[in-house]
Amino acid sequence: MCKLRTSKSIIKRFKFKSKNKILRRMAGRSHLLQKKSSKRKQKLRKIVNLKKIDISSWKFRVPYID
């Protein structure tokens, strides 16, 4: 049987705090910022939890994380 491989792109983009808690950055803050208001850009700075539905579908991509 093949080894399970960890997706390196996911390891770089997300922080794993526990089995059911994964942190991610908000999308939409890398370019085209002139037309976005400062209030909107401030809200995009947040680090938020990944939804439970997404966590269950991503478990196989990072098999060796707690």
UniProtKB/Swiss-Prot annotation:
Keyword Repeat: no
Primary localization class, coarse: plastid
GO cellular component, one term: chloroplast
Gene Ontology biological process: translation
Any single Pfam family the record assigns to this protein: Ribosomal_L35p
Any GO MF annotation of the entry: structural constituent of ribosome
Subcellular location as annotated: Plastid, Chloroplast
Keywords from the named record: Chloroplast, Plastid, Ribonucleoprotein, Ribosomal protein
Record-stated family: Belongs to the bacterial ribosomal protein bL35 family.
NCBIfam families according to UniProt: rpmI_bact (TIGR00001)
Protein name: Large ribosomal subunit protein bL35c
